[in-house]
Amino acid sequence: TGYATKVPNYNPREIIENLKRLIRKDDPLPMLPWFKSFTGEILEVSPERSVVSGRAYHAGKDTMVITELPIRVWTQSYKESVLEPLMKGSENSDSYALVDYKDYTDESTINYLLKFRPDYLENKDDAFICNLLKLQTTILTNQMVLFDPSGTLHRYASALDILKEFYCIRLQKYIHRKEYMESFLYAEFLKLSI
């Protein structure tokens, strides 16, 4: 009898631009989830799902630097659940991937320097490394349950469906605001002309 809702963030500038496109009677452009200051990559893999990737690069033969974590992955939990186990290896094996790591992360930037076992990264592709370092998460856009203009719960298939449904309401608000500003300026004009 309950419901779950998850509406990802979208770029306010893209929302504004799409509202302007609707006002001009143009079709809105597709929007991807967006997070301020996120420098990773967001790719739509289906209409209901986007993949969010952090950033890492090779800084030497056995060294990598992580400069961005996926959205909603916190630095402390990342160290505990990903980096520390990579240093210890699995419980039933002597294998380990990391020799050491340094955490140069601060409040505004992510910066992990990873030192791998000699030749561990040799012949490893980007997909393997991304999976090893758990640098990808997914964002689902199929749980957007919101109140519609009539006040009933409605499941929206996309952010553009939400935008289109509320476009008429927004347009009326723009018209009311314009009328208010015109009447205010006209009243000021009358005061000054006396």
Where are these regions (language model features)?
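Phosphate-handling active-site elements
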Residues: 11-22
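Charged, surface-exposed alpha-helical interface/stalk elements
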Residues: 20, 24-194
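Conserved phosphate/anionic-ligand binding catalytic regions in large, soluble enzymes, centered on
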Residues: 1-13
